[in-house]
Amino acid sequence: MELKIVSSEIIKPSSPTPQHLRTHKLSVLDQVAGDSLFPVILFYPQACSNDTTKTSDHLKKSLSETLSKYHPFAGRFKDAFSIDCDDSGAVFVEACVAGEMSEILKQPKNDLLEELMPYKLNEKPSVPVNLAAKVTYFGCGGMALCVCFSHVIADITTAANFIKSWVAISRGFSTSNDIPDTFFDCSTVFPPQDFSSFSRNAFADNHSQSAEIITKRFTFDGVKLADLKEKIRKESSSGYQPTRVEAVSAVILGGIMSAEKEGEKFNHTNLVPSVSVNLRNRTNPPLPELSIGNIIQAAITKLPIEKRINYSKLTEQLHGSIRSIDDEYLKKFHAVGEFMNNMQNALIALFDPNNRGFTISSWCRRPLYEADFGWGKPIWVSTAMKHKDVAVLLDSNDGKGIEALVALPKKEMDKFEQDPGILAYASVDTSII
């Protein structure tokens, strides 16, 4: 795919940040997030006429208005504890491709998706922005919009809320004045810590990028997923009905266990999944849904790597670890003087040589497929990644199935694809159209 950069510029907020909102305090959850940008990529089959300039101008104007409500995304890091919301702005890149968008949608490979990003996955931006967008126009009239968010101040809920607000302003349904204030000082609930002895990325080293990492997309269609959930329910001693995410996670973890057992060196005795949990509705009182930040915490459990994979057992263990993260748990975990000890214990479990860590992040049930800027809803929403031992789960475009992006070492990916559960319930890198 031959892509040409047409322009790159800084988009500043349409109105200055009020003085009392100039400093955005980071919570400890923001501090321990990986210092990287994560992409949300939306594909529109008929997004523009021949006048791409008009489309870009419309996107830039509405982005400017949206930034006036999401002040940290136009700011810059001041120190390890705060962002200066100084209206420096966000990056907006415009690109074009002579070819058809269908070339990507028929075989959506990770390296092709990476080309649609304003920066490569392992690239450090020359300008230290917290948000960067790139619009790519195809010769067929289609368009891909990639929005990259700093993981320090955004989880997928924050990202989805930002895109939703951008859409509303773009369509004229709202102005920046209509959007509720998005600020909520999460540093009072999850107090920041002094991590001066090591970098923010110390917590992300287990998922370092590597050329040997392969990312593939596994699609669990709605019919097979419903059958899987029912099978798990029948096999469960308690009759527990798993969620779609729990069922897919169990199959993925089962595949990891199978790949471990088939490996040349079977060094791990336990699989330690780390499942990202949205904390907004788990505190008492709940945090506002529009809270800005990386307001997630990992539910960690230790699973013995066994010869016989039992999906009902896996889902119940996952469900138990997720359910345990409630207000009482969070208050104890983040109590004064306790956080560092609790975090250290979690890291010891993840980096124990007998344990194999694996991260699961669910983007399901976010309104990403509702992002209609005026030219229809996206035909596909995805992301790109190269982090080792990570799975990102997204809704399929029909809303019934789940697409799982799984990143593994190449040799292990070959074994993972041949796992009986993966073969039975998932299709690999299938066409979107």
Curated annotation (Swiss-Prot):
Enzyme class: transferase
GO molecular function: acyltransferase activity; oxidoreductase activity
Catalytic activity line of the entry: (21S)-21-acetyl-1-hydroxy-apo-melianone + acetyl-CoA = epi-neemfruitin B + acetate + CoA + H(+)
Gene3D superfamilies: Chloramphenicol acetyltransferase-like domain
Record-annotated active site: H151 (proton acceptor), D372 (proton acceptor)
Pfam families per UniProt: Transferase (PF02458)
Pathway, per record: Secondary metabolite biosynthesis; terpenoid biosynthesis
InterPro entries reported in the protein's UniProt record: CAT-like_dom_sf
Disulfide cross-links: none
EC numbers, comma separated: 2.1.1.-
Record keyword Cell cycle present: no
Protein's UniProt keywords contain Transferase: yes
Tissue specificity annotation: Mainly expressed in petioles and, to a lower extent, in roots.
Superkingdom of origin organism: Eukaryota
Keywords: Acyltransferase, Transferase
Transmembrane segments: none
Record's subunit section: Monomer.
Function statement: Acetyltransferase involved in the biosynthesis of limonoids triterpene natural products such as azadirachtin, an antifeedant widely used as bioinsecticide, and possessing many medicinal applications including anti-tumoral, anti-malarial, anti-rheumatic, antibacterial, anti-inflammatory, anti-pyretic and diuretic effects. Catalyzes the formation of epi-neemfruitin B from (21S)-21-acetyl-1-hydroxy-apo-melianone.
UniProt similarity note: Belongs to the plant acyltransferase family.
Protein name: Epi-neemfruitin B synthase L1AT
